[in-house]
Amino acid sequence: MTATLVLPHELHGDGPHKVIAVHGWLADRSAYAPVLPDLDLASFQYAVVDLRGYGEARDASGAYTTAEGAADVLALADRLGWERFSLIGHSMGGSVVQRVLAAAPERVRRLVGVSPVPASGLPLPPEQWELFAGAAGTPDNRRVILDTTTGGRRPAGWLDRMVRRSVERSDAKAFRAWLDSWAGEDFHDRIEGSPVPALAVVGALDPALSAELQRATWMRWFPNAELVELPSCGHYAMDETPLDLIRVVEDFLRADAENTEDTEDAGAKP
C-alpha cells in the first residue's frame, strides 16, 4: 500500500457530531452537492472527501483499493483532530467506510451506507463485468450503468450530465482499478458482528444493490442494523430524493447516545 494521503475535502457545518462522507465509483465528492444546502449544520460537521483518482485527487497515485481508501479516511480524521466520527458511504464508498470500521472500530460512532456495496464484494456475471470494466474508457457504458441502476426512469439530460461529470472528474486508470477492489474483495469477516449502529439506505428502483441484497449481507452482519428503502428512487439518492435521504440519515445519526454528551459539553461553562 502507498503512503497515506490527506484527502482533498470540504467541511460543512460546525456541529459537535463529526461525519465523513465518501463518494461512489461514478463520481467525486460533488455527488453530495444536492444535499449540502439542507443539512443540519448546527448538529453536524461534515467532511466530504475526494478519493484517489477523483476530483482534486484525480492525479494522486495509489493502489486504488478500499483498504487504501480507508487508511486515507483515517489519516484525514487524524488531521482534523476527530477521534470519533460517523461515516457515510455511497455505493463503492459504502465498501470504503466498512473498511474504516474494520481498521478502527473504536473510532466509529455510526455507519451509513447509501446503496452500499457489501463487504463481501459484488461478483458480476460475465456480461455485466464486461460492461463495468469497459466503462473506464467508454462513456456510453457509464450511461448504461446509470440508466439501469435508476430503473430507466431518469431524463436523458440528467444521464448525460452525470456521464460528463464522471469522465471529467475521474482518472480512467484509477477508475478501472477501483472496480477490481470494490467488486472483487471480500472482507466481511472483519466487520461481521460489529455492534456499531449501521443504516443501509437503498432505492426501490435499483436492481443491483437492492433491499434484498442488503438483507442477505448488511442486515445479517450488523446486529444493530437498520434498512430503509426509498420508493421512486434508484442508486443515486442524493440526486433522486435528496430531502428524503437527508431526513432518514440525519434522524439515524441523531439517535446516537453520544449526542447528549456533545450537547452538554457544548453548553458547559468553564
PLM region spans:
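Gly/Ala-rich beta-loop-alpha elbow adjacent to hydrolase catalytic centers
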Residues: 89, 93, 97
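Conserved HGGG/HGGXW glycine-rich cap/lid loop of the alpha/beta-hydrolase fold
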Residues: 8-59
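Flexible "cap/lid" loop of the alpha/beta hydrolase fold
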Residues: 98, 102-103, 108-138
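Conserved loop-alpha-helix segment in the C-terminal half of the alpha/beta-hydrolase fold
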Residues: 199-233
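Catalytic active-site module of serine/aspartate enzymes centered on a nucleophile-bearing elbow/loop
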Residues: 224-270
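Short beta-strand immediately N-terminal to the catalytic nucleophile in serine-hydrolase-like folds
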Residues: 87-89, 114
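Conserved alpha/beta-hydrolase catalytic His-Asp/Glu region
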Residues: 122-123, 138-193
